[in-house]
Amino acid sequence: MSNDRLNSMRFMVWLATPLMWLVRPRVAPAENPAKELGIDPAKPVLYVLPTASLIDRIVLYRHCKQFNLPTPDFKPRYLGEPGKAAYLYLTKLGLLQPLRDNNAPAPLSDLVARAQSDKNLEVQLVPVSIIWGRDPARREKSLFKLVFADDEHAGMIQKVLIVIAQGRDTLLNIGKPISLRQQIDSQEDNSETARKLRRVLRVHFRQHRQVSLGPKLYDRAEVIGEVLRAKSVQQAIDRESEKDPGNRRRIELKAQRYVKEITAEPTHGVVRFLRAVLHYLWQKIFHGIETYHSEYLRDLAEKYEVVFMSCHRSHIDYLLLGYVVFEHGMVPPHTAAGINLNFWPVGSLLRRGGAFFLRRKFGGNRLYTAVFNEYVNFLVRRGHALNFFPEGGRSRTGRLLPPKTGMLAMILNGYVRSRTKPIVILPVYVGYDHVVEVKSYLRELQGGKKRPETIGQLLGARKLLRKRYGKAYVNFAKPIMVDEFLDQQHPSWRDEDLSHESKPLWLSKTVDELAEQGMCNINDAVVVSPIALTATAMLASPKRAMAESELLKFLEVAIRIISEGMNFQSGTISRTDPKDIVSFAEEVSSIKRFKYPGNDVLHLNEADAVVMSYYRNNIIHVFTLPSLIANFFLYQEEVSEQAILDGVKAFLPFLKREFFLRWSDDDENQFIRKTLHSMTDNGLLIHIGGSSPTYRRPIVAAEEYGLLKTMAGILQTILERYGITLAILGSF
């Protein structure tokens, strides 16, 4: 019987092949669903779909094949063998609409009864929803959208029309498995288990749709009206009118122009267009995009309003993060972009892709400040995901810049006033093997004037497509739950009536702390890329040159030391094979090879060394402890462990501030000792036991001594700068 059903399913999949040409779904999670979601192939799987749909089931079947997941061949009554999978519909469809029934479907009730009688039966319930068309639409619907837009309550006839219209804009959501055994064991009244499961699954489906589609879109007239009616904006208009009572209408029109200048106008059609363009662009200029810790993105989005807090390396950051979020089945965030990007045609495209624009300086313009603040409050109240760059502008040096807290203060102020869906701050590390604008950064650092963004620059950017820029890296850092953070900083915030107060007195200090924590989390999520690692080694060596064998050995040792003593919980090392790293660095960067019999030499000329310092600065904080410890041995053969601890702790307050490191006293002692042990295990130091533990450097003629000097060279110029500063201060 089961073989007949299996053959029948395969026949239906084959029969539907022409129809599937219209269907090109993206899958969330996109890379390895079984691993990311924790689906155990050794246990039976029951895929649960919200409504009965043969097309949905065929789409699921095809993609289970693609990702090596168990295929839904059977109905639940045939389920039981390891590696087998079945399917279940929570709701059956009538001709025009679903058949409403508050009871659990009979197959689910039967499966629960089987599991209650058979204690060895363990089934994984995997909720699956297919979103036909990712357009969140506006609050009012056209006739076309009423018929062709995805509707979870669509009947069979409407579903066919939806598939025809939306097949190329489809999202297949696969949820985390729910343990049937755990649900049964946790329920005292077994008769209610099936009903409870049905409710749990419905919540999953509702959250899937919410994350995938986001809030309803707004139009310009709606946002203009809501912002201008806000009390804070009306007060700002009143203040301006007091100076010139006869021109209130002119001031109101000025406020309206500000709203139009600021407001995003997201359109799903433009988002899809940008996604297609960016997909082509990334393939042309990058070897790939590496994304880390994206597996908890959707979990966060289901429970919180996500505010992305990203470091800023390049103009590409705006597009890259939105692209990554969209590819993971979520709505791209509203992104705060500089007004310098609001030029034709880029400004219009970015605005319709979800960017809103802000001036670099508000310059005491209280009316503009009130309008911008109220627009941010509007987005927070509506539940839109946000993205902003706390540094305020692109880093010209490769290091994180001190945060500018204005945007974060507006977001936090809007949240404590409106008390909407809980907010999570999600810091994001963005890095590149080659930053497109790096040469213009160097020109500006040398005193050159920043060139304004223009259409001419855009046309000139075509030459970028002729080059390859290595890889791009996006790492999602440890999230900061705003409610928990506020509870720690100001426990009574929930009890205060802040709805009419423009800005609580305690908010400024809290925002500063939150910004500092966010920056620390960004650096904690560092991606140690091949280019950055090679640049760090080359720039720390004398004359910016290293024999290939020496470079390979240093990379091997450095990778082991920072891996074993990795004090960065969210950080990662992109590549760990030294030969692979050097080969990739030669291909992408400006490192030159000079061939010599027996041992080639790799070299950076002076101009290229300045460029490579940008990439070294991306990861220099990873070497804080090993490089600082190595510097104690440049002029001393032996140093006691206690002297090392005291010396490192004397410098750490300065380095922690400069590199955004947030380590407690206990962490510092643990990290220092861990680094000492790792340096000893890798031959850079020699441990001498006894009542007073001591460390000795290798003999000068040893290869390991050269590696120790290179390790020390990473921070040497920074430590010399501290020394010069202290010497000058001491002379007064």
Where are the model-predicted features located?
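Membrane-interfacial terminal anchoring regions of lipid-handling membrane enzymes
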Residues: 1-732
